């Protein structure tokens, strides 16, 4: 980074530019240069451990920063004609006034609107309530903190997007190594290989693919029961985990969705409101290569799950103690797909549905020593050609020449030879 600096600050000391003072042509490689209200700094070059701080009412013009140099612009301060190069960091809120350019293009913040910033190396932007930011790039250790609204944010490796309650984000892209923490609202998020945690917020039309991980209802320390995701798409290589909250409508194509068992006393988590319900509602489609694993006790009553050929739905009751286990669900459509029922040592298994129909297979995995004719039964409307296979815990087939035979009253089915 070139400079015609006349003043050199490299001793780690602090210099203050006071009201009415102007400092020009400064090379700042270590230490702090603070521009107070009414002060002015021009043609400052900030690198290394240098830090230019523009306080409220202060002005900086033609600042260059990079190579670990930092520019901080306080609320009500002004920094114009900035040049940001590789390794530079800028820290500010939407109450500052700045403009300049970086390797990716031009950027500005003015009157509560921010556009085009590149935030990296610890740089951050705070989007205040009622303000807006768009086309922000977050890279290594760059952060965007949103209490207002934001759109078209790209989060790359090491970057972090945080949307607080009351904040909103739209059309954001989270790439490999990027993180999105949501407590407000978000729509049309693309998780292209990053991580998103919904911490009691609401998101819709989120796409998860290519190694990305989406988590609803947890940050790894606490469960948040108030979270909700709608119209979730999980494509090849994507993974979604519902620890708490509600999943409404989903299409899974080649990806994996896991609904964990709800808990009120998990020693690994602090539980919001002493409860952590997990709820699945609306329409869920499991397409070729897709899998959905649902822990025991999740509320599935308002769901309709369609399992296409090559798709797998797993209801996991392996944690249930005792001789019987009951799986309750809304509607299941088997269009060539498989439904696995996982049990422990239970000797009686019941599947309660509003409606089970189509053509496909139910696979029952059990550790039970004996299998009786009434080992499994279904309560609810049953239609179609549904085969049944029973396996041991290692999924070695015990019996596969079985089918579900609807009862005469039409409100259930029992196990019969095929």
UniProtKB/Swiss-Prot annotation:
Please spell out the taxonomic lineage of the organism that makes this protein.
Answer: Bacteria, Pseudomonadati, Pseudomonadota, Gammaproteobacteria, Enterobacterales
The protein's name in its UniProt record: Uncharacterized protein YdhQ
Q: Which domain of life is it from?
A: Bacteria
Give the encoding gene's name.
ydhQ
Give the matching InterPro entries: AIDA, Autotransporter_pectin_lyase_C, Pectin_lyase_fold/virulence, Pertactin_central
Which Gene3D superfamilies would you find in this protein's record? 2.160.20.20
């Amino acid at each position: 980074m070139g400079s015609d600096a006349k003043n050199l600050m490299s001793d780690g000391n602090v210099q203050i530019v006071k009201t009415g003072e102007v400092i020009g042509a400064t090379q700042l490689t270590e230490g702090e240069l603070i521009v107070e209200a009414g002060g002015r700094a021009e043609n400052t070059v900030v690198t290394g451990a240098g830090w230019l701080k523009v306080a409220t009412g202060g002005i900086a013009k033609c600042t260059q920063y990079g190579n670990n140099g930092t520019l901080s612009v306080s609320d009500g301060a002004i920094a114009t004609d900035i040049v940001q190069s590789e390794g530079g960091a800028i820290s500010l809120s939407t109450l500052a006034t700045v403009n300049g350019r970086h390797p990716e293009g031009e950027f500005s913040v003015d009157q509560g609107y921010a556009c085009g910033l590149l935030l990296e190396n610890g740089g951050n932007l705070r989007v205040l309530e009622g303000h807006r930011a768009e086309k922000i790039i977050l890279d290594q250790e760059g952060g965007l903190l949103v209490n207002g609204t934001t759109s078209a944010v790209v989060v790359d490796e090491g970057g972090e997007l945080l949307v607080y309650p009351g904040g909103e984000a739209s059309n954001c892209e989270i790439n490999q190594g990027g993180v999105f923490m949501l407590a407000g609202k978000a729509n049309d998020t693309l998780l292209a290989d990053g991580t998103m945690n919904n911490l009691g917020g609401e998101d819709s039309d989120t796409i998860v693919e290519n190694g990305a991980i989406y988590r609803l209802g947890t940050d790894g320390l606490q469960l948040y029961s108030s979270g909700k995701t709608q119209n979730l798409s999980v494509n090849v290589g994507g993974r979604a985990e519902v620890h708490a909250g509600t999943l409404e409508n989903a299409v899974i194509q080649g990806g994996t969705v896991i609904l964990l068992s709800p808990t009120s006393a998990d020693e690994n988590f602090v539980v919001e409101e002493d409860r952590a319900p997990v709820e699945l509602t609306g329409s869920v489609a499991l397409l070729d290569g897709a899998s959905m694993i649902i822990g025991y006790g999740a509320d599935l009553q308002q769901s309709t799950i369609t399992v296409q050929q090559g798709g797998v739905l797993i209801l996991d009751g392996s944690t249930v103690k005792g001789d019987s286990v009951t799986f309750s669900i809304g509607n299941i459509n088997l269009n060539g797909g498989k439904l696995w029922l996982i049990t422990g040592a239970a000797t009686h298994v019941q599947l309660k549905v509003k409606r089970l129909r189509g053509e496909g297979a139910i696979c029952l995995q059990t550790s039970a020593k004996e299998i009786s004719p009434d080992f499994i039964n279904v309560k609810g409307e049953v239609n179609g050609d549904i085969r049944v296979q029973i396996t041991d815990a290692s999924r070695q087939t015990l019996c596969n020449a079985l089918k579900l035979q609807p009862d005469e009253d039409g409100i259930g089915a029992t196990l019969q030879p095929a």
